[in-house]
UniProtKB/Swiss-Prot annotation:
GO terms for biological process: aerobic respiration. This is NADH-quinone oxidoreductase subunit I. The lineage of its organism: Bacteria, Pseudomonadati, Campylobacterota, Epsilonproteobacteria, Campylobacterales. [4Fe-4S] cluster 2 binds at C93, C122, C125, C128. Its cofactor is [4Fe-4S] cluster. Keywords: 4Fe-4S, Cell inner membrane, Cell membrane, Iron, Iron-sulfur, Membrane, Metal-binding, NAD, Quinone, Repeat, Translocase, Ubiquinone. GO terms for cellular component: plasma membrane. It is a peripheral membrane protein. [4Fe-4S] cluster 1 binds at C83, C86, C89, C132. Residues 74-103, 113-142 form the 4Fe-4S ferredoxin-type domain. The gene is nuoI. It comes from Campylobacter jejuni (strain RM1221). NDH-1 shuttles electrons from NADH, via FMN and iron-sulfur (Fe-S) centers, to quinones in the respiratory chain. The immediate electron acceptor for the enzyme in this species is believed to be ubiquinone. Couples the redox reaction to proton translocation (for every two electrons transferred, four hydrogen ions are translocated across the cytoplasmic membrane), and thus conserves the redox energy in a proton gradient.
Length: 213
């Protein structure tokens, strides 16, 4: 098979040094270059138009669904751990980086004794948070977890919400959490309607007493 080449007969090959320099200038200095320089100078001279931040003095506000280092949640009322030791997060982890050790307490219920995550191996896919039936493990917003070694483990006491900071814990709205309108998609029980009826009657009685006064 022969190779054919298209030859432009009108094209002149530069011979002298000046012709080579002239050709290089014509190819490099075009109108598009000045358009780009104009846009750059226009954005540079605008006030309060910075596209960057002064990290670490300033940090980007992360979205609720950002998946960073994990957190283990507690119940605010009882201060107990939400984790029931079902092991679903350990089973579904595609990076095989979650380890859990459980035992039975005096009531015969599972108790999580040790919980660890290899943060150097975790890919932060969010499967563990999505599969958790108790919303016990969620993804936080702590992304500054650089380490000097490849295997960087986080343990239960690192992820679990301290009791003294429990009042600051808020229901998580990120990966693995319920929708805000999740209650509308759940089938109600008869007790729910009885409670709603009692609440409506109490409100009605309160309004009538206020009008009589």
């Amino acid at each position: 098979m022969k190779n054919y080449y298209l030859v432009d007969e009108k094209r002149k090959t530069p011979v002298s040094t000046w012709e080579k320099i002239s050709q290089a200038l014509r190819r490099s200095v075009k109108l598009e270059l000045f358009v780009g320089l104009f846009v750059m100078m226009r954005e540079l001279l605008k006030r309060n138009n910075s596209a960057t931040i002064k990290y670490p003095f300033e940090k980007v506000k992360l979205d609720n669904r950002y998946r960073a280092v994990h957190r283990l949640m507690r119940f605010i009322e009882s201060e107990n751990e939400r984790c029931i030791g079902c092991g679903l997060c350990e089973k579904i982890c595609i990076s095989n980086c979650i380890r859990m050790e459980t035992s039975l307490d005096e009531n015969g219920r599972k108790k999580v004794g040790n919980y660890s995550i290899n943060l150097g191996r975790c890919i932060y896919c969010g499967f563990c948070a999505e599969v958790c039936p108790e919303l016990a493990i969620v993804h936080g917003t702590e992304y500054e977890n650089a380490a000097e070694q490849r295997s960087y483990f986080g343990y239960k006491q690192d992820f679990l919400t301290p009791i003294d900071k429990l009042k600051n814990q808020v229901e998580f709205e990120g990966a693995g959490s319920l929708r805000k309108d999740a209650n509308l998609w759940v089938k109600k029980t008869p007790n729910y309607y009885d409670a709603m009826l009692e609440s409506a009657l109490e409100n009605q009685n309160t309004q009538e007493q206020g009008e009589n006064k």
